[in-house]
C-alpha cells in the first residue's frame, strides 16, 4: 500500500512547500497504466503580488478557478499545447501554487517513452514533457491530490537542494530574478542540466 506524504499544503510558505516536494513520488494511475517518478524540480508562484503568477493582481477567470481553491488542489493549465501540473498551496482564496517541472521516472517507464516518443533523460526533464509522459491532462484540474488518480507519496531525500531564478520569466521586474526555482543538485532529469553538472546517484540522493 502506498504511504501518503504528510505535507501540509496550507500553513508553510509556498517556497517551503516547493522544497518539501523534491524527492516525493508523483503517481498517476490511469485505467491502463501506472506511472510514477520522483520529483526533482519545482517552482514557487506566490499569488497576487507575483508578476509571473497567473493570479497576479487578483486576476480570476474560469481557467484559474482551481488556483483559488484550498491547498492540495491540482491546477493544470495549457501552454503551447503542453499541460503544466501545479499543486495549489495556502488557504482557499490565496492563489499560490507550485509548478512540478521535472521527475525521475520510476514506474511505467517504457510507456512513458512511447507517450513522449523519446528515451533517456529527455522523457521527463521538463514540465510539459512529464505530463505527456505520465498522461496528465486538464481532466485532473481541480481535484485534490491523493483523493483520485493523482497522488504524491514519500520518496527519496535530496542531498542538496539548489535554488535559482525561475525558467522563462522575462520582463517581470524584480520577479524575474527572484530565486523561486528549486531542484535536486546534480540530478540528470533536472531541466537544462549540463553534463558537467551531473552527479552520481549516490551524490544527489541521501
Q: Residue ranges of each PLM-predicted region?
A:
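Conserved, well-structured core segments that form or line functional sites
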Residues: 1-206
Amino acid at each position: 500500500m502506498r504511504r501518503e506524504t504528510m505535507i501540509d499544503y496550507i500553513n508553510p510558505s509556498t517556497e517551503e512547500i516547493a522544497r518539501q516536494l523534491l524527492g516525493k513520488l508523483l503517481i498517476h494511475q490511469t485505467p491502463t497504466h501506472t506511472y510514477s517518478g520522483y520529483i526533482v524540480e519545482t517552482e514557487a508562484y506566490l499569488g497576487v503580488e507575483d508578476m509571473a503568477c497567473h493570479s497576479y493582481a487578483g486576476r480570476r477567470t474560469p481557467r484559474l478557478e482551481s488556483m483559488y481553491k484550498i491547498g492540495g488542489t491540482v491546477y493544470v493549465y495549457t501552454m503551447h499545447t503542453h499541460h503544466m501540473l501545479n499543486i495549489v498551496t495556502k488557504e482557499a482564496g490565496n492563489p499560490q501554487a507550485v509548478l512540478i517541472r521535472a521527475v525521475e521516472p520510476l514506474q511505467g517507464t517504457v510507456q512513458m517513452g512511447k507517450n513522449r516518443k523519446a528515451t533517456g533523460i529527455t522523457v521527463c526533464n521538463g514540465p510539459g514533457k512529464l505530463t505527456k509522459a505520465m498522461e496528465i491532462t486538464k481532466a485532473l484540474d481541480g481535484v485534490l491530490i491523493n483523493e483520485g488518480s493523482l497522488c504524491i507519496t514519500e520518496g527519496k531525500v535530496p542531498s542538496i537542494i539548489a535554488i535559482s531564478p525561475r525558467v522563462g520569466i522575462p520582463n517581470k521586474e524584480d520577479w524575474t530574478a527572484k530565486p523561486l526555482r528549486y531542484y535536486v543538485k546534480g540530478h540528470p532529469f533536472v531541466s537544462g542540466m549540463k553534463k558537467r553538472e551531473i552527479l552520481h546517484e549516490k551524490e544527489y540522493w541521501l
